[in-house]
């Protein structure tokens, strides 16, 4: 190939990779980061390939988050030395917390950005490349509601939808409010419009996201953009029924088959939400409600604003209205000052609650939180021993609850990446309406004509029904023939490699796109 012909070839876009740590909010923020970069001219790096830009979207909830980030950054240092044109960006909660300290610990990083200004990433990358100097930009308040940003969705069949950002609670163990700011809620019309956009692209399931979803309505944004003073939102009086109304409105969206939400706070959980869950067919019979501790004394020290009796009362009312609801929770073991009596109270509430599963954590001291300075910090050995006892109890309950599902017929939304052993076992995986993970045999459905069975391969995004044949603490098994198989637009999109996109973009196409690199071919070397 001649040099003239080589120069005539289209430029090669630089590639990116986003590495995500932490909660569902971070996962969704990473979709936005991907959307921003793609709008700016980057393309996603192939699996296993070295990306030109590596973005870390970090978590600051637990102490090992720091170690994980800086360990991974150190692994990239040799590559950065040999390929100075590659770029490394660090964003998210840990970046918001550490700020300039990121560069002190990892001076080869090119960009540091916070939770309030993720839309700045393409511009910061361009500025760092142009100036050949690291860029640190941490905003103190939200600059634009994140959902206005473009998002490159990971799933063709299920989508995250933020209904709020920030949190007004003051839990003594939690650093999130200081990093994410006060709660600001999206207007219902904006939330529903985003859901409709996803459904129009084939999405069957949405999960409504917020730090405290049942506080929704506390501070509606008057506009998706901040006014001149970034610390102020024009707001309207709180609507305490707003979240239940939003759930019912989701039920009126044609084509939306499943609605989930995470996470509600027990202190503000009201019966109108239970009624909306029970009376809205597409709201899934699943509730994730953090308990944290079963001890009233520890709950008070945590500033959780509820007590064990209130929590158990909510569970009783949910199960009365939705008998098949699967209830899951979060638990912290070893909070400062926790006695054996306090821990036993947690075991008692767990035993009474019969959670289908629980995310259980050993207390992690976070600088900047009130709990970090409390007396009575427990020895690691004590915390570890209690943690093991709690795990043993919850594993037994989870197994018993799953064994009760054997023989039931479940509808599954077929998923990808849920079963680590699917290839070895010749199974696929999917989620039941109550959120349980089911590994199933993908044999032809009994209701399909023979002529269609070869064509109707089960795909992620399709919907099947099957009968549960076995159980383990964390999943169900369904090894019989499928009872039904419904091909969906989501399955078509997944098979075609299409991903839904949402967001209005920044209005500045190409910002952050680096100068194109020339194509090299074997003939041009």
Curated annotation (Swiss-Prot):
Give every Radical SAM core domain span: 153-400
SMART domains named among the record's database cross-references: Elp3
List the GO molecular function terms: 4 iron, 4 sulfur cluster binding; metal ion binding; N6-isopentenyladenosine methylthiotransferase activity
Q: Which residues form the TRAM domain?
A: 403-482
Localisation per UniProt entry: Cytoplasm
Please name the Pfam families in this protein's record: Radical_SAM, UPF0004
Give binding positions for [4Fe-4S] cluster 1. Answer: 23, 59, 93
Q: Where in the numbering of this chain does the MTTase N-terminal domain appear?
A: 14-130
Q: What class of enzyme is it?
A: transferase
On the tree of life, the source organism's domain of life is Bacteria
Q: What is its EC number?
A: 2.8.4.3
Q: Which UniProt keywords apply?
A: 4Fe-4S, Cytoplasm, Iron, Iron-sulfur, Metal-binding, S-adenosyl-L-methionine, Transferase, tRNA processing
Catalysed reaction, written as an equation: N(6)-dimethylallyladenosine(37) in tRNA + (sulfur carrier)-SH + AH2 + 2 S-adenosyl-L-methionine = 2-methylsulfanyl-N(6)-dimethylallyladenosine(37) in tRNA + (sulfur carrier)-H + 5'-deoxyadenosine + L-methionine + A + S-adenosyl-L-homocysteine + 2 H(+)
Family annotation (InterPro entries): Elp3/MiaA/NifB-like_rSAM, Methylthiotransferase, Methylthiotransferase_CS, Methylthiotransferase_N, Methylthiotransferase_N_sf, MiaB_methiolase, rSAM, rSAM_horseshoe
Q: Name one GO cellular component term.
A: cytosol
Annotated residues for binding of [4Fe-4S] cluster 2: 167, 171, 174
Entry's PROSITE patterns? MTTASE_N, MTTASE_RADICAL, RADICAL_SAM, TRAM
Q: How is the cofactor bound?
A: Binds 2 [4Fe-4S] clusters. One cluster is coordinated with 3 cysteines and an exchangeable S-adenosyl-L-methionine.
Cofactor dependence is on: [4Fe-4S] cluster
Quaternary form? Monomer.
What this protein is reported to do is described as:
Catalyzes the methylthiolation of N6-(dimethylallyl)adenosine (i(6)A), leading to the formation of 2-methylthio-N6-(dimethylallyl)adenosine (ms(2)i(6)A) at position 37 in tRNAs that read codons beginning with uridine.
The entry assigns this protein to a family as follows:
Belongs to the methylthiotransferase family. MiaB subfamily.
| Name of the featured protein | tRNA-2-methylthio-N(6)-dimethylallyladenosine synthase
Q: What gene makes this protein?
A: miaB
């Amino acid at each position: 190939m001649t040099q003239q012909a080589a120069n005539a070839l289209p430029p090669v876009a630089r590639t990116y990779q986003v590495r995500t740590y932490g909660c569902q909010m971070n996962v969704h923020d990473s979709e936005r980061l991907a959307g921003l970069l793609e709008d700016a001219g980057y393309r996603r790096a192939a699996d296993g390939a070295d990306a030109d830009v590596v973005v870390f979207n970090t978590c600051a909830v637990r102490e090992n988050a720091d170690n994980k980030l800086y360990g991974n950054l150190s692994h990239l240092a040799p590559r950065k030395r040999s390929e100075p044109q590659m770029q490394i960006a660090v964003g998210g909660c840990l970046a918001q917390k550490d700020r300039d300290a990121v560069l002190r610990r990892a001076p080869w990083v090119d960009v540091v950005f916070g939770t309030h200004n993720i839309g700045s990433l393409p511009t910061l990358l361009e500025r760092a490349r142009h100036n050949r100097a690291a860029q640190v930009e941490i905003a103190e308040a939200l600059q634009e509601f994140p959902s206005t940003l473009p998002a490159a969705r990971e799933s063709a069949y299920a989508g995250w939808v933020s209904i709020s950002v920030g949190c007004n609670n003051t839990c003594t163990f939690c650093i999130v409010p200081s990093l994410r700011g006060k709660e600001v809620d999206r207007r219902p019309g904006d939330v529903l419009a985003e859901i409709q956009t996803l459904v129009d692209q084939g999405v069957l399931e949405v999960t409504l996201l917020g730090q405290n979803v049942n506080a929704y309505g506390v501070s509606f944004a008057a506009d998706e953009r901040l006014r001149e003073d970034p610390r102020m939102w024009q707001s309207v009086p709180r609507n305490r029924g707003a979240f239940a109304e939003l759930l019912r409105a989701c039920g009126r969206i044609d084509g939306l088959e499943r609605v989930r939400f995470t996470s509600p706070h027990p202190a503000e959980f009201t019966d109108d939400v239970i009624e909306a869950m029970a009376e809205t067919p597409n709201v899934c019979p699943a509730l994730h409600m953090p308990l944290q501790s079963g001890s009233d004394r520890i709950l008070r020290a945590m500033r959780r604003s509820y007590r064990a009796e209130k929590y158990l009362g909510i569970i009783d009312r949910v199960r009365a209205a939705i008998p098949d609801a699967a209830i899951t929770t979060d638990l912290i073991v070893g909070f400062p000052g926790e006695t054996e009596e306090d821990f036993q109270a947690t075991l008692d509430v767990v035993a009474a609650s019969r959670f289908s599963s629980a995310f259980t954590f050993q207390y992690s001291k976070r600088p900047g939180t009130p709990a970090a300075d409390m007396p009575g910090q427990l020895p690691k050995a004590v915390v570890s021993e209690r943690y093991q006892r709690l795990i043993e109890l919850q594993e037994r309950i989870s197994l018993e609850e799953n064994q009760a599902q054997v023989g039931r017929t479940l509808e599954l939304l077929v998923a990808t990446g849920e079963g680590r052993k699917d290839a070895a076992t010749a199974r696929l995986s999917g989620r039941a309406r109550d959120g349980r993970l089911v590994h199933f045999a993908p044999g032809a459905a009994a209701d399909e004509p023979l002529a269609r069975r070869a064509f109707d391969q089960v795909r992620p995004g399709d919907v099947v029904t099957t009968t549960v044949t076995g159980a383990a603490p964390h999943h169900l098994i369904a090894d019989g023939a499928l009872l039904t198989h419904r091909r969906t637009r989501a399955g078509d999109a997944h098979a075609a490699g299409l991903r839904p996109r949402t967001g209005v973009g920044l209005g500045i196409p190409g910002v952050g796109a680096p100068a194109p690199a020339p194509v090299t071919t074997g003939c041009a070397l």
